[in-house]
């Protein structure tokens, strides 16, 4: 039986973590699949790590792995850190704030099995996908950014910046060893490099919902950094 490792980066997710963990565990147990969750916490001051330790008591330390870091060191490096401890055949990355609902996990897994895909992406921009909780400006920026990146880089996928994905573990290990970007460009570079390797990619339409608790911000610096990143990836 294949095993699935979920990498869950956290920062101030005390309120969300118990619910998202319950739903992930419930989904895998209903599908009769072997699983683990690797929680990578960046020194959250709100008690996220204490909540994670309580979850270990409930589900077991073999199911909930807490691998904290000393501070906010970036999303990309969080995945790299968490991957060191993942023991699954497949690795799933997703957000802990309910932007990505665990109900889609069976669809990811089914699609991967049917086509033996190296990567399965959750896409907001294919048929039946969508974004909820964002204002029109942010929707426009996100959609435009994805169209720009997919056109310029020729990725062949509809959502290059989403962070709800399933990977064959060796594939992710290869990509992580090569990626150099940080921030919003990180996910995009992963896909660009995947295409260089001719890895196969499938897509599952998802409804992306803005975070349940806490704040989500997108500033001009993020936008400018993204544009710079798109064109820098032309030369990888």
Curated annotation (Swiss-Prot):
InterPro entries assigned: DPM1-like, Glyco_trans_2-like, Nucleotide-diphossugar_trans
GO BP terms, alphabetized: dolichol phosphate mannose biosynthetic process; dolichol-linked oligosaccharide biosynthetic process; GPI anchor biosynthetic process; protein O-linked mannosylation
Localization, UniProt: Endoplasmic reticulum
Residues the record lists as binding GDP-alpha-D-mannose: 9, 11, 13, 40, 42, 95-97, 124, 160, 211, 217
GO function terms (MF aspect): dolichyl-phosphate beta-D-mannosyltransferase activity; metal ion binding
Keywords from the named record: Endoplasmic reticulum, Glycosyltransferase, Magnesium, Manganese, Metal-binding, Transferase
SUPFAM superfamilies for this protein: Nucleotide-diphospho-sugar transferases (SSF53448)
Transmembrane parts of this sequence: none
Pathway membership: Protein modification; protein glycosylation
Entry function: Transfers mannose from GDP-mannose to dolichol monophosphate to form dolichol phosphate mannose (Dol-P-Man) which is the mannosyl donor in pathways leading to N-glycosylation, glycosyl phosphatidylinositol membrane anchoring, and O-mannosylation of proteins.
PANTHER family reported for this sequence: DOLICHOL-PHOSPHATE MANNOSYLTRANSFERASE SUBUNIT 1
Protein name per its UniProtKB record: Dolichol-phosphate mannosyltransferase
Name of the encoding gene: dpm1
């Amino acid at each position: 039986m294949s095993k699935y490792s979920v990498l869950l980066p956290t920062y101030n997710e005390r309120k969300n973590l118990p619910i998202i963990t319950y739903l992930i565990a419930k989904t895998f147990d209903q599908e009769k699949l072997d699983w683990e969750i690797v929680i990578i916490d960046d020194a959250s001051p709100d008690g996220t790590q204490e909540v994670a330790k309580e979850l270990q008591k409930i589900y077991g330390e073999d199911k909930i792995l807490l691998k904290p870091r000393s501070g906010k060191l970036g999303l990309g490096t969080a995945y790299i850190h968490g991957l060191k401890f993942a023991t699954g055949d497949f690795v799933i990355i997703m957000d802990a704030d309910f932007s990505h609902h665990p109900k889609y996990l069976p669809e990811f897994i089914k699609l991967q099995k049917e086509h033996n895909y190296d990567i399965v992406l959750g896409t907001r921009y294919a048929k039946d996908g969508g974004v909820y909780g964002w204002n029109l400006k942010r929707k426009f920026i996100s959609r435009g950014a994805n169209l720009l990146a997919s056109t310029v880089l020729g990725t062949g996928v509809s959502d290059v910046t989403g962070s709800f994905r399933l990977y064959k573990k060796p594939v992710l290990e290869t990509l992580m060893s090569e990626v150099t970007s940080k921030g919003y460009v990180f996910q995009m570079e992963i896909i660009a490099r995947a295409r260089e390797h001719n890895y196969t990619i499938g897509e599952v339409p998802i409804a992306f919902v803005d975070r349940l608790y806490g704040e989500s911000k997108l500033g001009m610096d993020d936008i400018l950094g993204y544009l710079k990143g798109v064109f820098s990836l032309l030369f990888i």
